């Protein structure tokens, strides 16, 4: 029997407004995900697929209007299970015509007050986040040690400055920062990108959160440092058993760290299942988009043959003009005459094709059992 999820996202919708185009962008459009205690769920997809916006929505960090306009984000915290979007729907009203959003009326001030009340004691304490650019996430005017001490004193039972300092040094040591007592007094500008990312990881885990969100934690680092950060995250997962939501466009990172995977395209989840099953080379059932992503990744075989990588034809879906049918239809190379009408005119449900494996595609008849 599967454990009750620590994080359950249901029908999440997060939209933004484009002033140049005078239209709403459906960045996250009906996403449902769950993460079990101790599990790492990897979310993968091209830039613009909605991965990071999903993560930021879960952490309550979407600030641009209209932002999160609907859904449920349930977190099983140390105290109780709570819906982090509870009651927010009364502050939002969406108007649509012919499948296109014409207006979003939102009491932004009331929404923010309610959202901050819901996130009180959650952000930082129950949910911690590693950002893709550690230099911009760290305070440039404060030492690494001071930022760690502040986090520890705010979110843990540490008694006094001295105990918080020792805990901070302990975490710098755990993330493999050399000479942690000396680095404690360093400012971010005096540390490399990889070292800043290690400090960010230490800061996130020092509060002993229930859920860690890692948003592109290796982006912007050179290949050697990327590998070391991935090794570090893998080791910390073993040591702490932390539940993790991992965002990446790098499938090799997902393969290394994730227990389950969710593939996103055009603001929706198109495939989800155990990582070993979804990413297996011999997989018989796979969403065409997942297959295209895997085909674009270099392998020892393609390197040996010096063959070209397979690019995904076309452009990433513009989620302003969402098609009536499958969102990948315009780029899909597996459409047959038998399913073309469905692909063009009806969005497929996310249906179970095997135990724990779901695919949003008309190629698989089992999709009808969503």
Features from the language model and the residues they span:
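Charged, flexible cofactor/metal-binding loops and thiol motifs
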Residues: 81-85, 98-105, 275-370
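P-loop NTP-binding/switch modules centered on Walker-like glycine-rich loops
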Residues: 221-305
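ABC-type ATPase nucleotide-binding domains, specifically the catalytic core motifs of the NBD
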Residues: 16-21, 62-65, 77-119, 146-163, ...
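Catalytic Walker B motif of ABC-type/P-loop ATPase nucleotide-binding domains
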Residues: 212-215
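A short, proline-enriched helix->beta-strand linker immediately N-terminal to the Walker B motif
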Residues: 206-210
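Conserved ABC ATPase "signature" region
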Residues: 163-182, 291-295
């Amino acid at each position: 029997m599967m454990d009750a999820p620590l994080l359950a996202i249901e029908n999440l919708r997060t939209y933004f407004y484009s002033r140049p185009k005078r239209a709403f962008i459906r960045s996250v459009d009906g996403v449902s995900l769950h993460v079990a205690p101790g599990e790492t769920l990897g979310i993968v997809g091209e830039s613009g697929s909605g991965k990071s916006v999903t993560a930021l929505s879960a952490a309550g960090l979407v600030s641009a209007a209209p932002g999160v306009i609907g859904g449920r984000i349930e977190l099983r915290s140390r105290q109780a299970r709570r819906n982090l979007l509870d009651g927010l729907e009364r502050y939002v009203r969406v108007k649509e015509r012919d499948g296109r959003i014409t207006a979003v009326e939102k009491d932004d001030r009331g929404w923010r007050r309610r959202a901050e009340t819901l996130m009180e004691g959650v952000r930082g304490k129950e949910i911690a986040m590693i950002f893709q650019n550690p230099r911009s996430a760290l305070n440039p005017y404060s030492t690494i040690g001071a930022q760690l001490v502040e986090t520890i004193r705010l979110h843990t039972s540490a008694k006094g400055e001295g105990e918080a300092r020792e805990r901070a040094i302990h975490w710098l040591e755990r993330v493999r920062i050399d000479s942690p007592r000396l680095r404690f007094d360093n400012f971010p500008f005096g540390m490399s990108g990889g070292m800043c990312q290690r400090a960010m990881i230490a800061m996130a885990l020092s509060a002993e959160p229930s859920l860690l969100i890692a948003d592109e934690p290796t982006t912007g680092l050179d290949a050697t440092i990327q590998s070391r950060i991935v090794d570090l995250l893998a080791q910390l997962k073993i040591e702490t058993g932390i539940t993790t939501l991992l965002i990446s466009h790098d499938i090799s990172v997902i393969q290394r760290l994730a227990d389950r995977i969710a593939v996103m395209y055009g603001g929706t989840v198109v495939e989800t299942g155990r990582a070993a099953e979804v990413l297996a080379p011999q997989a018989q059932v796979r969403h065409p988009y997942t297959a295209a992503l895997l085909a674009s990744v270099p392998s020892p075989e393609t390197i040996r043959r010096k063959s070209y990588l397979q690019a995904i034809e076309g452009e990433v879906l513009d989620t302003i003009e969402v098609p009536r049918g499958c969102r990948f239809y315009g780029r899909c190379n597996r459409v047959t005459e038998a399913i073309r009408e469905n692909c063009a005119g009806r969005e497929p449900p996310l249906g179970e094709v095997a135990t724990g494996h779901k695919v949003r595609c008309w190629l698989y008849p089992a999709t009808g059992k969503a």
